[in-house]
Amino acid sequence: MANTVILVDQPTLEKMKQTYLPFSNPKLPPGAVFAAKKTGVSITGYKSRKVMFQGVNGEVEAKKWVATLPESKTKAPSVSKGILPANFASKNVIGSDEVGTGDFFGPITVCAAYVDAEMMPLLKELGVKDSKAMKDPEICRIAEKIMPLVPHSVLLCPNPKYNELQKRGMNQGQMKALLHNRAIENVLKKLAPVKPEAILIDQFAEKNTYYRYLAKEPSIIREDVFFATKAEGLHLSVAAASIIARYKFVQAFDAMSKEVGIPLPKGAGPHVDAVAAEIIERFGLETLAKYTKQHFANTEKALKMVKK
């Protein structure tokens, strides 16, 4: 079995843990902080910040993450700050980001937003920055202030549609690529005849993989497109897109909670299993499917809780 080991920083390790939650394996080897299994690859992340990829797709999966490959003494293909044009942070850019991919409940939500140099001082004054450390109330407060100022497009993939696409063989990467491409296209149409100097996508797949996912799309945005991990820190457009996406995600979550009559939790941990089991007991499995990503391990865990 082919093994690939990469060394990552702590924020990347946490991001990987969240990304692989839908494929999580509860049995952790000694020293591990997460373990997951996807088609053709098993992934194990360790406290040492080393992540091991085992299987025929191990190397391909590893290359999605910006990190050193110690075993081969080479570097994974890196799409990061280094390849962006000079003074990128001050350019007029469309940025895009997504939320909801690691949450059992709720839709995948993608936002593309345009920020030009003239707008930047005001956005900074309003609190636009990397939103990962922000709580929902702050996210919502800032989003409501910037949405009238920032040309943007938000697209949601509701859970019933997500489940339908997933059963037809589409993975999350494909869904995200479609949503990013369409959201960016929507913003370009709003801006016309003005053109951005660049487009920056918060990277979730290699460039070639991203465009392969879009192969059947009638319109594919390729001109001046860049991909980078941690893109919120590289341009305010991505930070703004992330804030707006999270705001819309929170709104969708609140609406679903009211509809089902139960406060729905974010994430995909044990606390989520308990709420899912309650929904199954009260309303049935079909109702749960309306609000969740069915292929997550939480579905089976909740069913086992109900059967006890």
Swiss-Prot record:
Any one GO biological process: DNA replication, removal of RNA primer
InterPro entries: RNase_HII/HIII, RNase_HII/HIII_dom, RNase_HIII, RNase_HIII_N, RNaseH-like_sf, RNaseH_sf, TBP_dom_sf
Keyword Nuclease recorded: yes
Superkingdom of this protein's organism: Bacteria
GO MF, any single term: RNA binding
CDD domains: RNase_HII_bacteria_HIII_like, RNAse_HIII_N
EC annotation from Swiss-Prot or TrEMBL: 3.1.26.4
Pfam families hit by this protein: DUF3378, RNase_HII
Keyword terms, alphabetized: Cytoplasm, Endonuclease, Hydrolase, Magnesium, Metal-binding, Nuclease
PANTHER family hit by this protein: RIBONUCLEASE (PTHR10954:SF23), RIBONUCLEASE H2 SUBUNIT A (PTHR10954)
Functional description taken from the UniProt entry: Endonuclease that specifically degrades the RNA of RNA-DNA hybrids.
Protein name, entry field: Ribonuclease HIII
Gene source species: Listeria monocytogenes serotype 4b (strain CLIP80459)
Lineage of the organism: Bacteria, Bacillati, Bacillota, Bacilli, Bacillales
